[in-house]
């Protein structure tokens, strides 16, 4: 008790010294908490994927250009045993697009895909169901559904997409709490009756024990883009990239929009170093107060 009283008397006498150390300690801890939250979000990108370590995207390199593509487009010249593939999810990004609801035009970012998308990614169902088998169905995110219909029940409502086709809302899903590489407002059915006129992408989940190094070695051999067209001499290679690395790839798309987000590891390292320095500063301030 006497020690505590002595410390309080000294702290009150050295008010400036005490205030500086207390403010330094509080500021350091506050900044560390903010930075740690940011760092945690960067390291937990796409954790809503069922298994982000085993889901792969296709990276195509052609004559110095790299882009995300689809394996099935070139599968006539790629020798990957079909039995190694567990799930194939094909989707077409429709960024910078729009739809019409109740006579009003709304900008949107959409993915045209099928129900296999939900075998790779887990979303909480808010209303309706997660089903894209009906070619006239659409699934909205919770925030976008509120933007279109407010507090009304969106299930059964009809929207008109930019291609002139009408779609009926079959479900509403919540956006994941974590950060995601793919961001969208709605999911549309990718069926033969819906032609999107944009390049599709594909995600794959392979069976346990699949030799990914061997598959990527196969893809590293240059192949002709159109082997049946003698005049087309373009060559390409491909590689399968784990989904958890797509966010860090920095591989820009030809169309800038809001669907893809990218991470910067160099920037993250700077923030980690800054967090460590701030933590050390806070520890020094605590030691200064403790040794009074």
Regions found by a protein language model. Give the residues of each.
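N-terminal membrane-entry
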Residues: 259-278
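Short, strongly hydrophobic transmembrane alpha-helices
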Residues: 14-41, 281
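Hydrophobic alpha-helical transmembrane segments
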Residues: 4, 18-19, 270-271
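A short amphipathic helical element positioned immediately N-terminal to and/or at the very start
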Residues: 3-14, 78
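Structured, solvent-exposed hinge/loop segments at the ends of secondary-structure elements
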Residues: 32-152, 161-167, 217
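A hydrophobic alpha-helix feature that marks transmembrane segments and, especially
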Residues: 273-292
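Mid-to-C-terminal secondary-structure elements
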Residues: 114-126, 138-263
């Amino acid at each position: 008790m006497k020690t505590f009283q002595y410390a309080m008397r000294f702290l009150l006498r050295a008010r400036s010294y005490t205030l500086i150390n207390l403010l330094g300690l509080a500021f350091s801890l506050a900044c560390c908490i903010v930075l740690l939250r940011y760092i945690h979000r960067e390291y937990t990108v796409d954790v809503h994927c069922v298994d982000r370590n085993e889901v792969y995207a296709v990276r195509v390199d052609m004559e110095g250009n790299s882009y995300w593509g689809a394996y099935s487009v070139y599968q006539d010249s790629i020798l990957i045993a079909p039995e190694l593939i567990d799930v194939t999810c094909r989707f077409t990004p429709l960024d910078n697009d729009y739809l019409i609801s109740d006579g009003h035009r709304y900008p949107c970012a959409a993915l045209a895909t099928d129900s296999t998308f939900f075998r790779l990614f887990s979303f909480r169902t808010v209303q309706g169901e997660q089903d894209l088998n009906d070619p006239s169905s659409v699934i909205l995110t919770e925030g976008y559904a509120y933007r279109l219909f407010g507090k009304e029940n969106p299930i059964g409502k009809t929207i008109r997409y930019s291609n002139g086709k009408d779609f009926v809302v079959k479900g509403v899903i919540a956006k994941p709490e974590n950060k995601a590489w793919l961001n969208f407002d709605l999911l549309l059915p990718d069926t033969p009756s819906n032609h999107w006129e944009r390049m599709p992408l594909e995600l794959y989940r392979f069976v346990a024990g699949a030799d990914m190094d061997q598959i990527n070695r196969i893809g590293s051999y240059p192949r002709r883009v159109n082997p049946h067209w003698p005049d087309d001499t373009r060559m390409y290679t491909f590689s399968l990239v784990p989904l958890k690395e797509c966010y860090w790839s920095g591989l820009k798309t030809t169309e800038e929009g809001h669907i893809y987000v990218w991470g910067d590891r160099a920037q993250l390292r700077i923030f980690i170093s800054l967090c460590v320095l701030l933590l050390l500063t806070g520890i020094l301030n605590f030691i200064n107060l403790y040794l009074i």
